[in-house]
Amino acid sequence: EIGSGLVGSEMCIRDSEWSIPAANITDIPQFEYRGLHLDVGRHLYPVSFIKKYIDLMSMQKMNRFHWHLTEDQGWRIEIKKHPKLTEIGSMRKETIINRYSAAIPGIYDGTPYGGFYTQEEIKEIVAYAKERYITIIPEVDLPGHMLAALATYPELGCTGGPYEVGTRWGIYDDVLCAGNENILSLIHISEPTRPEPIS
């Protein structure tokens, strides 16, 4: 792979004055897919952090960035056809801050939390990764882990709600209704990996 080879060569000459000693370097990755995952659905990271993350991936010769963009706790990608996804689905009213169970009630911080990436920011990150020979794989959970979308469009659920953006971790019973054809318009969001605008 060219990208991996360039990273390896750059490491050899980092502290020199751009001369490469005579050498034969054999640097073949053991695995074709060398990826790292980042969950921004539960916790939003700034673009600057994601770029640093991609830089560190490149230094380790990783080639796939698995970007977890949606979750019960937040919808993080701007979809122009569905602006309510970011107006409503990107914000949760608070976040649980303790371990909880049936016997231990949840303790919440009482602080609204959220945000999302604009199409322009996503394109910027995709281009940044591509320059470092890293492919972005956007992830949208289906049919579960979709409370952020259900809070926005309750008619897409099997029960009709009411729903709210998730404030605790774990598994929720509410999911998208697989028989509802309207959910198809939500799942075409892998388009940020293309140069055209996301619709």
Please give the residue ranges for each predicted region.
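Hydrophobic faces of well-ordered beta-strands that scaffold small-molecule active sites
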Residues: R34-L38, F65-W67, I136-V140
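An active-site-proximal structural segment forming one wall of the substrate-binding cleft
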Residues: M62, I125-P143, L176-S190, R194
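Aromatic- and acidic-residue-enriched carbohydrate-binding clefts of CAZyme catalytic domains
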Residues: Q73-E131, A148-E181
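Single conserved hydrophobic/aromatic residue that forms the stacking wall/gate
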Residues: E1-G8, C12-I13, H188-S199
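Flexible hinge/switch segments at interdomain interfaces of large molecular machines
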Residues: A23-E32, T159-T167
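A conserved hydrophobic secondary-structure block that centers on an alpha-helix together
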Residues: D39-D72
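Contiguous, structured surface segment used for ligand recognition
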Residues: G3-S4, S9-F31
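Active-site-proximal loop/turn and secondary-structure-junction residues that shape catalytic pockets
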Residues: R42, L69-Q73, K81, V140-M146
